[in-house]
């Protein structure tokens, strides 16, 4: 299989996209479509590489730099300190003696990863610029955000690191060749990786609105060109905790009892015009569930009681959601079934309280063994009433 692709973005500006075809997991996420690690090369009086890649691709990276730049490298810009963007830095410095351009806080983390005693650093702050010959690079950063962004003023290109990324491999590298399906990939990435940093990202978005942008070049996935305004608008929405009239119903079930409650709730909600998305935990990966929860108004979680607790997959879900700290502008509903003693919904409600959700509770949503026909009618009615409640 092809290990990397090269795309010429503009004269003397290239994307080296290193392809991880068979990756199944990234930071605990299920990765179904692979991912890429994008490194960017600018050839000028001073040659610059913006972020590197995983060490297993070093030979390919080195070969390309020899071919197009004769291994002349003056600056390595480190927008992010995680290994998928930095593992090749040490070897590149040994071969080129390039200077590292980064922020004070990111230097601290590079010092923790490498022996940097002999490295030459250029420490930059938000708004600082670096002239590399015919081009000026401007740096955008917020120390509460994991990522620094680099803007090429003359070419109107934003190198955004993880912002605007997607975990996906397409044979095409530009959004114009793919279409709007890329938006779902970008939403999934935001919901599962960037969501805890949304307040800092919103500050960065306020800076970006004053920039003239022709390309946004992220560290993973596809480059943005014709859909820049749309992805910026989406990011602003996701960062501002706005929501749609959507209900995400997530559940685990053993003997279909909890599933019957889930379906009845969904029918009641949909009858009142709410868009309903079902996720059964034995078939839906957490990252897709979180993508849908991101801008949903209602989050309904169901579990049978097992060993005086929630189903293990529900426990994993709740822990995962809490770690990502979604908006508290949501209505939370717990439901479930039990045999001896009901415990699951209490655990779910405790998690909702920690998340700050508005909780709507009703005894009609818990059943010993399974709901009967008359119970199903009551559950649907609860769903219809739920659709009229405001956050």
Swiss-Prot record:
Top-rank taxon? Archaea
Give the Gene Ontology MF terms in alphabetical order: electron transfer activity; FMN binding; metal ion binding; oxidoreductase activity
Pfam families in the record: Flavodoxin_1 (PF00258), ODP (PF19583)
What positions does the domain Flavodoxin-like occupy? 247-387
Which SUPFAM superfamilies does its entry note? Flavoproteins, Metallo-hydrolase/oxidoreductase
What stretch or stretches form a coiled coil here?
none
Q: What is this protein called?
A: Uncharacterized protein MJ0534
Tell me the organism. Methanocaldococcus jannaschii (strain ATCC 43067 / DSM 2661 / JAL-1 / JCM 10045 / NBRC 100440) (Methanococcus jannaschii)
Lineage runs: Archaea, Methanobacteriati, Methanobacteriota, Methanomada group, Methanococci
């Amino acid at each position: 299989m092809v290990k990397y692709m090269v795309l010429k973005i503009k004269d003397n500006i290239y994307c080296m996209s290193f392809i991880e075809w068979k990756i199944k997991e990234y930071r605990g996420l299920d990765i179904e479509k692979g991912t890429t690690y994008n490194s960017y090369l600018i050839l000028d009086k001073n040659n610059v590489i913006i972020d590197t890649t995983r060490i297993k691709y070093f030979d390919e990276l080195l070969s390309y730099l020899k071919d197009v730049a004769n291994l002349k490298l003056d600056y390595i810009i480190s927008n992010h300190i995680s290994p998928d963007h930095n593992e090749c830095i040490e070897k590149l410095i040994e071969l080129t003696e390039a200077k590292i351009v980064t922020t004070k806080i990111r230097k601290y983390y590079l010092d923790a990863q490498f022996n940097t005693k002999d490295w030459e650093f250029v420490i930059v702050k938000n708004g600082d610029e670096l002239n590399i010959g015919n081009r000026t690079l401007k740096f955008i950063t917020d120390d509460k955000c994991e990522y620094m962004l680099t803007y090429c003023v003359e070419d109107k290109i934003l190198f955004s690191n993880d912002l605007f990324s997607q975990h996906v491999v397409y044979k095409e590298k530009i959004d114009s060749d793919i279409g709007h399906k890329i938006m779902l990939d970008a939403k999934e990435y935001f919901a599962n990786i960037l969501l805890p940093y949304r307040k800092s990202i919103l500050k960065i978005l306020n800076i970006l609105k004053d920039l003239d942008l022709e390309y946004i070049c992220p560290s993973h996935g596809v480059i943005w060109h014709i859909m820049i305004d749309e992805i910026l608008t989406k990011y602003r929405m996701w960062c501002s905790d706005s929501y749609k009239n959507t209900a995400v119903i997530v559940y685990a079930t053993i003997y279909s009892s909890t599933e019957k409650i889930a379906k009845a709730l969904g029918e009641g909600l949909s009858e009142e015009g709410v868009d309903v998305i079902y996720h059964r935990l034995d078939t839906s990966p957490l990252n897709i569930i979180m993508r849908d929860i991101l801008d949903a108004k209602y989050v309904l979680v169901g579990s049978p009681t097992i060993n005086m607790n929630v189903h293990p997959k529900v426990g994993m879900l709740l822990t995962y959601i809490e770690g990502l700290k979604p908006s508290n502008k949501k209505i939370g509903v717990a439901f479930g079934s039990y045999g001896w003693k009901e415990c699951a919904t209490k655990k779910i409600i405790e998690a909702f309280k920690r998340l700050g959700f508005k909780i709507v509770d009703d005894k009609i949503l818990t059943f010993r063994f399974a709901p009967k026909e008359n119970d199903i009618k009551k559950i649907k009615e609860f769903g219809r009433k739920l659709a009229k409640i405001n956050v």
